[in-house]
């Protein structure tokens, strides 16, 4: 999947393109939605926060379910119920942006991770995956905003909610149940959201010193930590975005990441019209998050 900054950028651009509500409250909550089920990944994952039951598996399972139509159908029911009012709608818009970008771009990231692993098997596919996403975040930030990582705080990705966390937790509880028939306590979802904020804070690296330090520490090891941190600039020899248009897909796909991102943005209007008027299976067309 694209990483956190890229999802943030996409949701902001889609919101502007589609004239979504732009109150400060809506924008904050939409950014949380833009991270999709990924916020669950952080639950009980941070150092000193690993004790007790974790609900991170439901985020991973949602990403890998063959067809997320049950999730989309539940979001459509939330629309009919007007769950959370305009704030709830903003979160759903962000979540749908997450799904649209993931299903368009994640096949490339998966394939590219395997190719990088074939060329350098010292790093497992999972760490190449993280390395590619981190570099793409750096590249997308420069492309879309003309900024370098040191000019942006990652904390903006999950801004303070000022009392709206229960609305988000209620949505996540409903879509987990719709997808897997599992009742997850709201308290654990709220805990996962807090862990996500902590994870973002720990990943914030505006000086670049964290990335430099951990990359040196992991020089002859797997990039367990450094691959999660944004580099100041990407490795020019790595072609993380496939600007050379090497074939990567089973059907001969060779698009670069920027083209895939632009395609998702171009399709956003049609996608949201389908969501508003058709059943969930017509929205997903059987395409998973990844």
Regions found by a protein language model. Give the residues of each.
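N-terminal leader/auxiliary helical segments
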Residues: 1-94, 99-290
